[in-house]
């Protein structure tokens, strides 16, 4: 992360003053909480966007009260519930995105709304992850930037902010070591980014399973996945209401170690004999 801090400093020193010269938002917010300094490191800033593109208002009026009115289109700070739609105003607009970054997909909001995180947020669970939890707020970086929290090098740590035990199990697993060596993104390789779904045994086995993308039928990896799926199915069958036990077992799945998975199953509230049948 020290390298990221150094990169930030260099960008701030090299950034031209075009935005600041035309935008009175920077005058106050540099002094108040430093938001504008952080924003100068943001991918949106470097694409020519300003505070007003998200927040509305008139940045050319040198009066805070006059610049932030309904007449100037000022928008209040987004809440957790409204952040996805807030970001989606631009990121779901193909015409706008074609001008800013035609390489970016414009279905990310639609995917998020259908995902487990999106459904939880829509159901009123405000602790569910939304855009800024993963991407940041005023210092958002391109995914290709190694300092971005959603870059291949950082994404596992970003997911770990919520999924602590699962990320720890993954880091020490064969996949964790291999992905680090190959500089491949961790969690999102299997779980996707915006279209994340609740984990099921279908991810482990079957023609549409995640595991078969890399592990051919009959390989050691495929056999391990099938064995893990069997243990999960047995516990689900033995006690469908054993939510805590199943949660612990799904964490253990990320070790990709049959012994660790079986130990987690044996520690379930139901009898080990029932799980092993």
Where does each model-flagged region fall?
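Accessible peptide chain termini
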Residues: 1-2, 45
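Short sequence/structural segments immediately N-terminal
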Residues: 16-277
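Bacterial N-terminal signal peptides
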Residues: 2-14
């Amino acid at each position: 992360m020290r390298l990221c801090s150094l990169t930030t400093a260099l960008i701030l020193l090299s950034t031209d003053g075009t935005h600041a010269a035309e935008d009175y938002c920077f005058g106050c917010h540099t002094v108040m909480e430093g938001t504008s300094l952080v924003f100068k490191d943001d991918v949106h800033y470097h694409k020519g966007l300003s505070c007003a593109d998200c927040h509305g208002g008139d940045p050319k009026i040198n009066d805070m009260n006059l610049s932030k009115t309904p007449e100037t289109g000022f928008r209040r700070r987004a809440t957790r519930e409204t952040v996805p739609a807030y970001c989606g105003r631009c990121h779901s607009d193909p015409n706008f995105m074609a001008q800013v970054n035609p390489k970016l997909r414009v279905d990310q909001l639609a995917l998020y709304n259908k995902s487990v995180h999106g459904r939880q947020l829509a159901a009123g669970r405000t602790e569910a992850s939304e855009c800024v939890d993963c991407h940041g707020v005023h210092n958002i970086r391109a995914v290709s930037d190694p300092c971005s929290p959603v870059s291949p090098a950082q994404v596992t740590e970003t997911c770990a902010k919520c999924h602590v035990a699962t990320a720890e199990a993954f880091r020490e697993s064969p996949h964790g070591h291999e992905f680090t060596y190959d500089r491949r993104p961790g969690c999102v390789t299997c779980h996707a980014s915006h279209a994340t779904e609740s984990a099921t045994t279908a991810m482990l086995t079957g023609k549409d399973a995640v595991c078969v993308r890399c592990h051919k039928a009959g390989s050691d990896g495929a056999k391990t996945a099938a064995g893990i799926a069997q243990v999960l199915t047995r516990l689900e069958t033995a006690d469908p209401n054993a939510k805590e036990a199943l949660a612990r077992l799904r964490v253990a799945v990320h070790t990709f170690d049959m012994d660790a998975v079986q130990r987690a199953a044996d520690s379930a509230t139901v009898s080990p004999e029932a799980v092993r049948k």
